[in-house]
Regions:
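Active-site-proximal alpha-helix that buttresses catalytic centers in soluble enzyme cores
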Residues: 1-297
Length: 297
């Protein structure tokens, strides 16, 4: 990915939206980290987070910012049910640009709905990085790479995102096999032994954060954990690689969204919005200026 332009938006707010969890604190950790890093760089006048399953919730977040120019970036892995249905409904969005009329004590505001972080082209590199980290020294030519997504019957885009990444990596001809598999749609990850033949199998969860799915659900479905364990402290599952199953070695990676370079992906989604809709970024209170504050770290 090319270096992001250096920018500063002191008159604008950034709202970063995550899923969150009522039972696992690790679920919101990446979103909170990236928001904190963006705030530290001084990129926006305001930076706040909101979550579907934690406080503050989606419906509260617009009352948490004073800016009239607001960028909203979903820290989600794909453009699917949450980004197309839930978030627009909860925030009252009507497409990429929504104008909220003035009301007593609050001027009119412009909401700029950016693409989810997971739509960024850098996802392919994050997946490959995770695979290399999980199985250092393993020859990709002797390995199957399995990318695991959630999958859902509610929106086909959830599966499309995984399959798109699998196709991109397959086209590089690095791994002996590259497959997209799922928790809740076919092909189910439970069938990994039938769908792969390589002696080494590397499994990378295509999720923003580590939580119930990567700590518990996927390990049980893979057969590397007998039953669902405790919600917290599940990172131990990644430290036991490789697992020996059916005469083959299975390597299991953590999710990709905790990568610190993910912060730059979030900023890139704001820049992409401005590039595609430049006239919306020319208002005096929303002007961008060159600044070293938002340079990549």
């Amino acid at each position: 990915m090319n270096p992001a332009p250096i920018f500063q938006k002191p008159g604008s707010a950034l709202i970063l939206l995550g899923h969150g969890s009522t039972v696992n604190p690790d679920s919101s950790a990446p979103t909170l980290y990236h928001a904190g890093e963006i705030k530290r760089r001084g990129c926006f006048g305001e930076v706040v987070c909101a979550f579907w399953k934690e406080e503050p919730g989606f419906r509260q977040v617009l009352d948490m910012v004073e800016s009239t120019d607001i960028y909203i970036v979903p820290n989600f892995i794909s453009e699917g049910y949450f980004t197309q249905k839930i978030i627009p409904r909860e925030l009252g969005l009507h497409g990429p640009v929504t104008t909220l009329p003035a009301r007593p004590g609050r001027p009119a505001r412009i909401l700029k709905y950016c693409e989810p972080a997971g739509n960024h082209s850098r996802m392919t590199e994050f997946l490959l990085d995770r695979a290399r980290e999980a199985a250092p020294g393993v020859d990709p030519g002797q390995a199957a790479l399995v990318i695991v997504g959630h999958g859902t019957s509610l929106n086909e885009n959830s599966g499309l995102a995984v399959n798109k990444q699998a196709a991109r990596i397959r086209a590089r001809h690095q791994y002996a096999e590259v497959l997209g598999m799922f928790i809740e749609q076919t092909p189910f990850v439970t069938g990994w032994q039938q769908h792969t033949t390589a002696p080494n199998v590397i499994v990378v969860p295509f999720f923003i954060s580590d939580g119930m799915h990567s700590y518990q659900d996927i390990p049980v479905l893979l057969g590397i954990q007998a039953a669902r364990g405790a919600a917290a402290g599940g990172a131990e599952i990644f430290r036991r690689d490789p697992y020996s199953i059916g005469g083959r070695r299975l390597y299991y990676s953590s999710a990709i969204g905790a990568d610190r370079l993910f912060t730059d992906v979030i900023l890139d989604q704001v820049l992409r919005f401005d590039t595609r809709r430049p006239r919306l970024s020319c208002a005096p209170d929303a002007a961008s200026s060159l600044s070293p504050g938002c340079a990549r770290r």
